Amino acid sequence: IAAGLQNVGADHNLQAIAQYLMAGKKLISFNGAADPLISPRDHLRNWQTVVQLAGSAGSNARFYLEPGVGHVLGGNGPDQTDYLGAMIAWVEQGTAPGQLVLTKFDSNGNATSSLPDCPYPTVPHYSGSGSVSAAASYTCATS
C-alpha cells in the first residue's frame, strides 16, 4: 500500500511537515469537498495532526475545504482562487490568509458563481439575502 501511495504522491511524514511549520515556514492546504480521489476527511485529519504536532507554530498553517469541488478543479462548486497570491501576502507582508473567494468560470472565461473560501474550521453560511451564486451573500462561520 505504501508503495502505491508513493506512486500517486500521497506519501507524507506529518512530523516533518510540523517541523517545517516550527521552522517558521507557511503552509496553505486545500481539498475539494467532492474530491473522489483524496478523502477530504483524511486530509483534514492529517492537517489537524500536523497543527497539533507543531504546537504554537500550527498558526503557520491554513486549511480550506472547497464546497462542491472535485479533485483539484472541477465539480459543481466554484473552483478557482488565488492561493499563490495569499501565500505571497502571508510570507512577504505578514498578512495571514483568511476568507478568500472561489469563482466558477464558464468556457468563455466569464464568472458564473462564487463562494467564500473559508479557512477551517469555518464554512460558508448563506446570509439569507442576495444571490446564492455570489460570495457576497455568505459569511464564513463555524457550523
Give a label for each model feature.
Residues 1-143:
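C-terminal His-loop and adjacent cap/lid subdomain of alpha/beta-hydrolase
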